[in-house]
């Protein structure tokens, strides 16, 4: 089976069209071999069974892509320095100095790049290929090739690198667990890690442990890396752009229209570097408030190590982005008081790089807004510095000052605690809905943090949801196209909430029915949050409507499971009776729930086991409206017995207490619902009858 999730015809076609690259990985010397040609050669070698050749070509493809970017950055920096753009002069010839400098810079770039890269057209990869590299698909091929070559450490790192950008890929996760079983506890390396993001995460970890000196070291290094990456991102935006609204032969732009078209795309790209740098691999949405958070952590960390000058400097840097933040305003005032008599607080300014970035960002925003009005295109400014909810709901964010008379004034850190296995566990809270029936608690299910409920949804809702599922599900959806991700004896089909709403909005399924999926998942979330008596908000991490169907002719003498025994936020090691809470596990998941839609199938029981993955502690037969929920850690290993006849459907829900890991599609679905509600209100106010399905 192909390592990726789509047809590889385009890549293989590219291999056929590039005979010079096939069967080899480029000649020594000469211009840099295009990464798309090397990739095509690697894929061709893989499917031809030449795994050594595949690994060699894929490694060179990845290296070529990195070298291409590095060479373009080097040349663009060099030509920026050598050829300064001239100001416009007065009179009819006033534009000539500017355009003359522009032409000289273009010539500089060509003469700089051509010796190493060759003609620019050699490196214009197809969108599909660029997307593969963005999604790290070459690493999926690489890990398979390494397995065949018995290079298990390299295979594990390639699999881990792919998984970091594809966290829902269950097959790769299983592969990594197999590597751990085979080679013991291995140290996995993300070969495409963003250094500034790694340093930020390390800084936050040390901060959480109150190791403030180490936190400062990593967070300061993260800032250095961030600003360096921002400069690189700005420069890379100066490359070719696509004119999607004018991709037809008749388009003939005038001089200024063509310049404006291109520059607006460059400017929008540069403006969005802030989002790019704040986005983790494989995610669409950035970490909210990412850059300001560095200064927020640092202002308190510096206070705790006694460096009040740096604390005030970082507090004022943070206030550039959020000048009305009362907590940090109080902190800054407190730091000023600590410095009285030693340093004049007025001499301590926000950091220059933060001021410069914010000034540039505001100017970019202004130009984009002006251009949108003048050139007639739509532009909506994202909230790049958005803070999610109240400060106390954010993860590990420094807060305000409190006075404690017995010790004198000092800072009080208010932060949402990171969920730990030894936190106080509660259950038995209200179920919130009168029709929901309690069945079993943790003790009755022979475990910890478990509950079984019935009547969460009605028979009619089950039928309606099943009808929606039939209209929107695709084989392999949610499993990167793998139709049988856990067992070859069953077919898996799935869909997300956002997909359901999209289909409903397009009229492909009744919108009322599509919204039911959204509403019942929210109902389940509220029940779980209430029953387990959580003192902070429970967020969606992933929501998936999934049906698994027994394949006819493949059910005799089955001894496999529909879904192998696993834990949801750690890597289960049955032999060691351990569950390793580390990547690539979904370590941010805290609670899970399965809401069942039907019972007309054979097999498919949900089971809890001991950590040995063998001793069954509870078995649950699905039926319409039944929901099992549990904490996601190693205390609750679970799986699904083989479905031997019929189709088993359920809504699978995973939740997190960390808002940084909220489900991206859920946020988008919330926006769709808000938009639909607003449209509905608008129609009501105009006394217009909405469509039936609304």
From Swiss-Prot:
TPR repeats, residue ranges: 35-68, 136-169, 196-229, 292-325
**Which catalysed reactions does the entry list for this protein?**
L-prolyl-[collagen] + 2-oxoglutarate + O2 = trans-3-hydroxy-L-prolyl-[collagen] + succinate + CO2
Keywords, in A-Z order: Coiled coil, Dioxygenase, Endoplasmic reticulum, Glycoprotein, Golgi apparatus, Iron, Metal-binding, Oxidoreductase, Repeat, Sarcoplasmic reticulum, Signal, TPR repeat, Vitamin C
Please indicate the residue ranges that the annotation assigns to the motif Prevents secretion from ER: 691-694
A GO BP term here is: negative regulation of cell population proliferation
Which Enzyme Commission numbers does its entry carry? 1.14.11.7
> Which cellular compartments is it found in?
Endoplasmic reticulum; Sarcoplasmic reticulum; Golgi apparatus
Q: Where does Fe cation bind?
A: 566, 568, 638
Write out the coiled-coil annotation as residue ranges: 386-418
Primary enzyme class: oxidoreductase
- Active-site residues are 648
The chain positions of domain Fe2OG dioxygenase read: 543-657
Q: Signal peptide: which range, if any?
A: 1-23
SMART domains for this protein: P4Hc
Instruction: Please give the residues the UniProt entry marks as glycosylated.
Output: 446, 535
Region (Disordered) residue spans: 395-427
Cofactors per UniProt? Answer: Fe cation; L-ascorbate
Q: Give the CC-aspect GO terms.
A: basement membrane; endoplasmic reticulum; Golgi apparatus; sarcoplasmic reticulum
MF-aspect GO terms: iron ion binding; L-ascorbic acid binding; procollagen-proline 3-dioxygenase activity
Q: Output the PROSITE patterns linked to this UniProt entry.
A: ER_TARGET, FE2OG_OXY
What is the recorded function of this protein according to its Swiss-Prot or TrEMBL entry? Prolyl 3-hydroxylase that catalyzes the post-translational formation of 3-hydroxyproline on collagens. Contributes to proline 3-hydroxylation of collagen COL4A1 and COL1A1 in tendons, the eye sclera and in the eye lens capsule. Has high activity with the type IV collagen COL4A1, and lower activity with COL1A1. Catalyzes hydroxylation of the first Pro in Gly-Pro-Hyp sequences where Hyp is 4-hydroxyproline. Has no activity on substrates that lack 4-hydroxyproline in the third position.
Q: Which family does it belong to?
A: Belongs to the leprecan family.
Classification via PANTHER family? LEPRECAN 1, PROLYL 3-HYDROXYLASE 2
What name is this protein filed under?
Prolyl 3-hydroxylase 2
Q: Taxonomic classification, please?
A: Eukaryota, Metazoa, Chordata, Craniata, Vertebrata
| Gene from which the chain derives | P3H2
């Amino acid at each position: 089976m192909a390592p990726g999730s789509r047809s590889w015809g385009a890549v293989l076609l590219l291999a056929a069209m590039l005979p010079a690259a096939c069967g080899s990985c480029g000649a020594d010397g000469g211009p840099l071999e295009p990464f798309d040609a090397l990739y095509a050669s690697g894929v061709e070698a893989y499917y031809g069974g030449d795994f050594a050749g595949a690994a060699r070509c894929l490694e060179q493809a990845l290296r070529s892509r990195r070298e291409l970017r590095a060479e373009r950055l080097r040349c663009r920096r060099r030509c920026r320095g050598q050829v300064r753009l001239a100001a416009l002069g007065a009179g009819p010839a006033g534009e000539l100095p500017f355009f003359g400098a522009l032409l000289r810079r273009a010539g500089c770039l060509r003469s700089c790049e051509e010796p190493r890269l060759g003609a620019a057209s050699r490196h214009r990869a197809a969108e599909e290929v660029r997307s593969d590299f963005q999604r790290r698909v070459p690493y999926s091929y690489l890990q398979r090739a390494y397995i065949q070559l018995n290079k298990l450490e390299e295979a594990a790192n390639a699999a881990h690198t792919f998984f970091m950008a594809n966290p829902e890929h269950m097959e790769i996760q299983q592969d990594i667990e197999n590597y751990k079983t085979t080679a013991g506890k291995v140290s996995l390396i993300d070969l495409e890690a963003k250094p500034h993001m790694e340093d930020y995460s390390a800084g936050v970890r040390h901060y959480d442990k109150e190791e403030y000196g180490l936190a400062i070291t990593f967070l300061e290094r993260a800032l250095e890396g961030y600003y360096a990456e921002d400069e690189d991102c700005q420069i890379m935006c100066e490359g070719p752009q696509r004119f999607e609204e004018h991709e037809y032969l008749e388009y003939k732009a005038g001089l200024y229209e063509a310049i404006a078209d291109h520059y607006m795309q460059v400017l929008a790209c540069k403006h969005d570097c802030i989002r790019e740098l704040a986005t983790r691999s494989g995610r669409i949405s950035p970490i909210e408030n990412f850059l300001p958070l560095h200064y927020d952590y640092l202002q308190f960390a510096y206070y705790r190590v006694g460096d009040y000058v740096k604390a005030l400097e970082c507090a004022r840097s943070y206030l550039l982005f959020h000048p009305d933040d009362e907590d940090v305003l109080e902190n800054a005032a407190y730091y000023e008081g600590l410095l009285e008599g030693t340093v004049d607080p007025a001499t301590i300014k926000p950091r220059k790089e933060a001021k410069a970035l914010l000034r540039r960002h505001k100017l970019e925003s202004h130009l984009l807004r002006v251009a949108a009005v003048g050139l007639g295109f739509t532009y909506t400014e994202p909230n790049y510095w958005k803070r999610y909810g109240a400060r106390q709901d954010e993860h590990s964010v420094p807060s305000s000052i409190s006075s404690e008379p017995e010790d004198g004034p000092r800072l009080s850190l208010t932060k949402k605690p990171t969920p730990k296995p030894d936190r106080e566990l509660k259950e038995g809270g209200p179920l919130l809905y009168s029709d929901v029936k309690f069945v079993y608690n943790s003790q009755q299910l022979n475990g910890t943090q478990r509950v079984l409920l019935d009547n969460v949804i009605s028979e009619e809702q089950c039928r309606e949801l099943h009808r929606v599922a039939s209209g929107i599900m695709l084989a392999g959806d949610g499993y990167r196209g793998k139709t049988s991700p856990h067992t070859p004896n069953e077919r898996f089909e799935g869909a997300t909430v956002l997909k359901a709403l999209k289909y409903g909005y397009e009229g492909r399924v009744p919108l009322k029915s599509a919204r039911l999926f959204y509403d019942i998942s929210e109902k389940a979330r509220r029940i779980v949050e209430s029953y387990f008596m959580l003192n902070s908000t429970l967020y969606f991490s992933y929501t998936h409507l999934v049906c698994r169907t027994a394949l006819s002719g493949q059910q005799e003498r089955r001894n496999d499971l529909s879904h192998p025994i696993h834990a949801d936020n750690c890597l289960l090691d049955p032999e060691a009776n351990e569950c390793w809470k580390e990547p690539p596990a979904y370590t941010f998941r805290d609670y899970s729930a399965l809401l069942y839609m039907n019972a007309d199938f054979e097999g498919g029981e949900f089971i809890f086991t001991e950590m040995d993955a063998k001793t069954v502690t509870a078995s649950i037969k699905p039926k319409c409206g039944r929901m099992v929920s549990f904490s996601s850690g190693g205390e609750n290993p679970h799986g699904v017995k083989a479905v031997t006849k019929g189709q088993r459907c359920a809504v699978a829900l995973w939740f997190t207490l960390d808002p940084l890991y909220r489900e991206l599609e859920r946020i988008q679905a919330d926006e769709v619902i808000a938009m639909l509600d607003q449209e509905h209100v608008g129609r009501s106010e105009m006394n217009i009858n909405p469509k039936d399905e609304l």
